[in-house]
């Protein structure tokens, strides 16, 4: 494992493999980390030497501190959990405006509110394409989110009190308590266990993720419950109930992120099965309890899938994107085919990012854990379990096609327990090189021959870690917080508050999106499969696509036939460029040297006057205002579906980054005249 972390965490393999994923930022980031490590290491060596000269009674003091921690373990962990909760809440408000910002978060909150209303899906609108969104499934008149039901079910607890944003801070704080309970059972040194718990609670990767709406946080909570149940199950006093807790934890994690749960449930099952079949132990009860615990959530998941997708083993993302979304080396929903080489690139990029995002320290974040794993002479059974589960997790994402970068390499979030545990163990592992503590005995100060240098090394390493953390807290963390606070500005706008301030009620609000978003929505309206729509949009000249859609729409050509009619546009992929300054949209690809017709130029000019995003408006709570995508003359369908309402156009008055959308009152008669004129062209 240490060798893997050294190779994948320090070498830019992705940059050495032609094509595919890469880490273009590696040189700059590596230079910064190397500089920070040099400063921390140099200072740490000086501190380690000086501390050795003034060291007095350190062994006894550590023994006293360890005993004090052990006596009041629950108080220490409880304090960390409460403090972490307050920190997560504060970061959620300051960094993310207590709102879901990524499309994954938005759609899971939409599904959570459907669940909170007592439904698994809602009926489609008469013209659903005005209300469509990426990751929102529209199947046979049913509308629901693409994600496994467990994540939205966790958020639904917050929906019941109009506070989805509080769910992850609560679950993150509970995870701190669970990790504290777990690590105290598997780590004999109280000080090391407390340090690991503190790192788990306060690692910036954990803080930012716990302040978000992402489903990785509740997944880790249930994984930890499964691990606590597992440790109790394999103890001499393990009972059927412990196995049930273990199974429920892994089973509920599977209802949120099935691959993450499988990675840690599979080795747990093997461990329990081995104990049940052992000639000396024959512990069958925990195995049966775990089997029942896993089965109950999975049966519930299968029933929900049956009621939504129509098949117990089919998920919403398979309905939306096809089998290309699944694990394996094959074609993907969009982009190149996923191959083992691309899998290696992704895993490498994940671990290179972890070097910064895990602790935001002055040096590489994975270095202490790597050193501890390399120097450790023996592993406990739980250590082996945790490492096997971690390897399986990495293996699953090696076979997955998507990068999924957000707030760090989020797919690696379940590695947090093993990484913080081995980071915290490094000082003890170094001490074990010259005392008997490697067997879990308390330090006695009795050194082995030839180990006089090890105490200084240990002090220098410990000082380096502390200095690196302090430097990171003073430099990297504020920069990361500023980065998150300044990102995704347009998704933070509160439609309900703005509408109430403007006195807008019982209105039909037409939301002006970019030309590119309109083109994608029009393909969805024609029934073009989502993966085909993404592929075509990423390749086609937007004007040619617009004209092609204009020919298909009145002809009533839909579904596979529409996708086939648009397929020749894929040949555009080698020609267009992305002149964002000329279009206002970085996703539009214009063909150089081509003179566009007036209608296409008008679309470009409309882009330049400002546009906004539709998906966040799916979360507007004011029920009497209807927010629908603006699709030009097709909006006349909305006027028939929702008669008697005041009509507004929602768009910013400027294309400046962060410009708030503005409600513009529209006259229905003028709109109808404009649409009739457009239809006669």
How would you label these PLM feature ranges?
Residues 75-79, 248, 269, 291-295, ...:
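Signature aromatic-anchored transmembrane alpha helix within multi-pass, membrane-resident enzymes
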Residues 108-109, 209-210, 216, 256, ...:
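Hydrophobic/aromatic-rich transmembrane helices and adjacent perimembrane loops
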Residues 229-244, 262-303:
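Perimembrane helix-loop-helix junctions
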Residues 49, 174-180, 269-272, 278, ...:
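Hydrophobic, aromatic-rich transmembrane alpha-helices
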Residues 5-8, 76-88, 200, 267, ...:
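Transmembrane alpha-helix segments characteristic
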Residues 20-36, 129-137, 283-287, 306, ...:
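Membrane-lumen/periplasm interface segments of multi-pass, membrane-embedded glycan/lipid transferases
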Residues 103, 167-177, 190, 194-230, ...:
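Multi-pass, polyprenyl lipid-linked donor-dependent membrane glycosyltransferases
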Residues 237-240, 275-290, 369-390, 403, ...:
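Membrane-interface helix-loop-helix junctions at transmembrane boundaries of multi-pass membrane enzymes
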């Amino acid at each position: 494992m240490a060798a893997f972390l050294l190779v994948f965490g320090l070498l830019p393999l992705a940059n050495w493999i032609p094509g595919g994923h890469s880490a273009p930022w590696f040189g700059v980031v590596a230079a910064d980390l190397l500089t920070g490590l040099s400063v921390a290491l140099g200072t740490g060596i000086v501190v380690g030497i000086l501390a050795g000269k003034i060291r007095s009674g350190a062994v006894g003091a550590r023994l006293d501190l360890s005993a004090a921690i052990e006596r009041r373990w629950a108080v220490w962990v409880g304090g960390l959990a409460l403090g972490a909760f307050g920190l997560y809440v504060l970061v959620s408000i300051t960094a993310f405006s207590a709102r879901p910002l990524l499309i994954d978060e938005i759609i899971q909150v939409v599904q959570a509110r459907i669940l909170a209303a007592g439904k698994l899906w809602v009926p489609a609108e008469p013209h659903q394409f005005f209300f469509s969104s990426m990751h929102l499934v529209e199947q046979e008149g049913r509308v629901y989110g693409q994600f496994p039901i467990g994540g939205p079910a966790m958020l639904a607890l917050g929906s019941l009190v109009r506070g989805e944003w509080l769910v992850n801070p609560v679950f993150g704080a509970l995870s701190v308590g669970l990790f504290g309970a777990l690590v105290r059972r598997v780590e004999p040194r109280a000080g090391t266990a407390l340090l690991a718990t503190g790192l788990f609670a306060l690692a910036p990767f954990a803080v930012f993720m716990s302040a978000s709406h992402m489903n990785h946080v509740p997944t880790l909570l249930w994984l930890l419950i499964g691990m606590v149940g597992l440790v109790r199950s394999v103890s001499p006093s393990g009972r059927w109930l412990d196995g049930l807790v273990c199974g429920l934890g892994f089973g509920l994690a599977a209802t949120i992120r099935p691959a993450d749960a499988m990675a840690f449930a599979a080795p747990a099952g093997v461990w329990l099965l081995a104990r049940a079949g052992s000639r000396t132990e024959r512990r069958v009860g925990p195995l049966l309890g775990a089997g029942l615990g896993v089965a109950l959530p999975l049966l519930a998941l299968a029933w929900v899938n049956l009621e939504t997708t129509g098949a117990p083993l089919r998920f919403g993302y398979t309905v939306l994107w096809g089998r290309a979304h699944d694990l394996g080396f094959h074609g993907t929903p969009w982009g190149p085919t996923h191959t083992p080489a691309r899998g290696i690139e992704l895993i490498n990029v994940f671990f290179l990012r972890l070097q910064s995002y895990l602790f935001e320290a002055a040096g590489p974040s994975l270095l202490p854990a790597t050193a501890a794993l390399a120097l450790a002479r023996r592993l406990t059974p739980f250590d082996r379990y945790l490492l096997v589960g971690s390897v399986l997790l990495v293996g699953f994402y090696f076979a997955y096609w998507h990068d999924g970068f957000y707030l760090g390499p989020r797919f690696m979030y379940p590695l947090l327990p093993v990484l913080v545990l081995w980071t915290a163990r490094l000082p003890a592992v170094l001490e074990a090189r010259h005392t008997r503590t490697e067997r879990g005995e308390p330090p006695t100060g009795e050194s082995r021959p030839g180990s006089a240098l090890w105490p200084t090394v240990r002090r220098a390493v410990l000082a380096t870690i502390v200095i690196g953390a302090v430097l990171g807290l003073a430099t990297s963390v504020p920069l990361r917080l500023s980065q998150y606070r300044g990102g995704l500005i347009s998704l933070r706008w509160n439609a309900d508050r703005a509408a109430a301030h403007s006195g807008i009620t019982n209105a039909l609000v037409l939301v002006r999106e970019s030309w590119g978003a309109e083109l994608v929505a029009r393909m969805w309206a024609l029934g073009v499969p989502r993966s085909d729509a993404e592929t075509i949009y990423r390749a086609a000249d937007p004007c040619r696509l617009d004209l092609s859609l204009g020919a298909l729409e009145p002809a009533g050509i839909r579904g596979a036939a529409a996708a086939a009619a648009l397929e020749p546009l894929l040949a555009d992929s080698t020609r267009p460029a992305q002149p964002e300054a000329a279009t206002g949209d970085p996703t539009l690809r214009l063909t150089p040297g081509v003179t566009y017709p007036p209608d296409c130029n008008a679309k470009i000019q409309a882009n330049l006057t400002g546009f906004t995003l539709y998906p966040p408006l799916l979360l507007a709570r004011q029920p009497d205002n209807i927010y629908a995508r603006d699709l030009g003359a097709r909006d006349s369908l909305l006027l028939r579906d929702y008669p008697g309402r005041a009509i507004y156009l929602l768009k910013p008055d400027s294309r400046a980054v962060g410009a708030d959308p503005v409600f513009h009152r529209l006259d229905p008669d003028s709109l109808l005249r404009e649409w009739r004129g457009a239809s006669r062209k």
